[in-house]
Amino acid sequence: MKGSVFRKKSIQDLIAATSGEKSLKRELGAFDLTLLGIGAIIGTGIFVLTGTGAVTAGPGLTISFVVAALACLFAALSYAEFASSVPVSGSVYTFTYATLGELMAFIIGWDLILEYMLAVSAVSVGWSGYFQSFLSGLGIHLPVALTAAPGAVKGTFTLFNLPAFVIVMAITYLLYLGIKESKRVNNIMVILKILVVLLFIAVAAVYVKPHNWQPFMPMGFGGVFSAAALVFFAFIGFDAVSSAAEETKNPAKDLPKGIIFSLLVCTILYVTVSAIMTGVIPFAQFAGVDHPVSLVLQSAGQNWVAGIIDIGAVLGMTTVMLVMLYGQTRVMFAMSRDGLVPGSLSKVHPKHKTPYVATWFFGTMSALLGSLVPLDELAKLVNIGTLSAFVLISVAVIVLRKKQPDLPRAFKCPGVPVIPGLAILFCLFLILNLGWVTIVRFLVWLLIGLVIYFLYSRKHSKLNQ
């Protein structure tokens, strides 16, 4: 098995590595996990992609959100089983190494690199839209060429999204210095984000004109499913809950609660917001708009509330970028430590104690992509990366049930293999709705990864030594 691409890290070794001096403190309950999930989920999806989704599906966007939420729920139950039976930090990459072997772990790690890097880029584009909306409220306007990526706004010459570039580089610098994430700060930020969304609902609901909901599905089910594949981005982040397994007081009870409650709260908020948005403004007016939520309020003459929404969106999306870039470096660090990518990526700064090479490299890449590539293209690639990860996790649950039926599982996914099977079908269906261009781009990325694995990673893997 030494040279095999299917060699595995044993689950017992993974769990043993977390005990002793390097074990994490178990202090998170179901409430903390729910807020952690909501904190990671609410961001660009609700503040930005609701506009793009409305153009694709019309008022039927509400159904798109429910379809995307179902795909997430089925995958989430598989995630919860994994997290409770392999309660180790390192997310899907670690789980896959233990169950499906090294090659699949490398592919998922390579997939996560794409997902996290492009997620930071996509969120930075949304952040830029709200930041510029906030500036224009103060009478400050940037040169048009520096407001968006080339080709992002039809009929307008744009060259470079300067605010998107600057915010990612600023966050990269913060992470290079070292940042202590705290439960309290996250909980306060999340409550603030929820309040901003509730404020929008309360103020905008009175301006709804029901005739704007006709026709409900102007592009038919095709439009609804295409939008579901796009707004799936709005739910990315709930997997952050499962990666906190090591720090949860009672993983068996609290993990599934945290995952399901956070998905439920976000789905209700998303459906309500999209119904109000398409009720206030005819859906076609959202074309090319990267601050749709505040646009709705501006059109209703509620400029001061729009300003509050802009600030809330800017703060909310800053935390999402921070967590995503942090997660990116953590996956890279794990892969580098396992010998699958060059050792320099796990180099730790002598003073700041941070993986500084990985931080600066991926921070710069994310900043450039965010400033040069339009948002919907970025979002589609993030989605295909995440959906592929969900498919693999669901397959891994079925495999692990067969291969290791006696493994202690604090939480069991109900209805195996039906529920993981539904997750696989839903996710593959959404992948097909992302369009062939996105699928081909993703396959090219995977092909580059496979070349790297067979030329470098297989030889340098720690399991090979």
From Swiss-Prot:
- According to its UniProt record, where is this protein located? Cell membrane
The domain of life for this entry's organism is Bacteria
Q: Which GO terms describe its cellular component?
A: plasma membrane
Effect of disrupting the coding gene: Mutant is still able to take up isoleucine, leucine and valine. Deletion of the gene confers a weak resistance to growth inhibition by serine. The deletion of the three permease-encoding genes aimA (ybeC), ybxG and bcaP results in an unprecedented resistance to serine up to 100 mM.
Keyword Transmembrane helix (UniProt)? yes
Question: What is the membrane topology here?
Answer: Multi-pass membrane protein
Transmembrane parts of this sequence: 35-55, 57-77, 103-123, 133-153, 159-179, 188-208, 216-236, 258-278, 305-325, 355-375, 380-400, 413-432, 437-456
Q: What does the induction field say?
A: Expression is repressed by the transcriptional regulator CodY. Contains two CodY-binding sites in the bcaP regulatory region, which both contribute to repression in vivo and do so independently of each other. A single CodY-binding site is apparently sufficient for substantial CodY-dependent regulation, but both upstream and downstram CodY-binding regions are required for maximal repression of bcaP. Efficient bcaP repression by CodY requires the simultaneous presence of isoleucine, leucine and valine, and other amino acids in the growth medium.
Question: Which Pfam families has this protein been placed in?
Answer: AA_permease_2
How does its record describe regulation of its activity? Isoleucine uptake is efficiently reduced in the presence of 100-fold excess valine, leucine, alanine, threonine, serine, cysteine, asparagine, and a nonproteinaceous amino acid 4-azaleucine.
Assigned protein family: Belongs to the amino acid-polyamine-organocation (APC) superfamily.
Q: What exactly does this protein do?
A: Branched-chain amino acid transport system which is involved in the uptake of isoleucine, valine and probably leucine. Can also transport threonine, and is active as a minor serine permease. May be an amino acid permease of rather broad specificity, because several amino acids, albeit at 100-fold excess, are able to prevent isoleucine uptake. Probably does not transport methionine.
Q: What is this protein called?
A: Branched-chain amino acid permease BcaP
Source species, please? Bacillus subtilis (strain 168)
